[in-house]
Amino acid sequence: MAHKKGVGSSKNGRESHSKRLGVKVFGGEICKAGDILVRQRGTKHHPGNNVGIGKDHTLYSLIEGRVIFRKKQENRSYVSVEIIA
């Protein structure tokens, strides 16, 4: 019989915090210039008219207007902002 207590290292504590990715302003909604539209890893959604892209592939609005999601090519989504008349 062992007389020493078995000491094991913890196997928990490796979970990373969620990165809060995804669409922040949906199609048909109104946005202001500079609003973040989509946070993503890679270009799941591509920038369309009046939309800029950050170094971490975040899409943001360049003007105030209405957000539009379109699929121009096979499996390629574009996010645009249209001026409200």
Swiss-Prot record:
SUPFAM superfamilies: Ribosomal L27 protein-like. Keywords: Ribonucleoprotein, Ribosomal protein. InterPro entries: Ribosomal_bL27 (IPR001684), Ribosomal_bL27_CS (IPR018261). HAMAP family: Ribosomal_bL27. It comes from the Bacteria. GO terms for cellular component: cytosolic large ribosomal subunit. Belongs to the bacterial ribosomal protein bL27 family. The gene is rpmA. GO terms for molecular function: structural constituent of ribosome. Pfam families: Ribosomal_L27 (PF01016). Transmembrane segments: none annotated. This is Large ribosomal subunit protein bL27. One of its GO terms (biological process) is translation. It comes from Azobacteroides pseudotrichonymphae genomovar. CFP2.
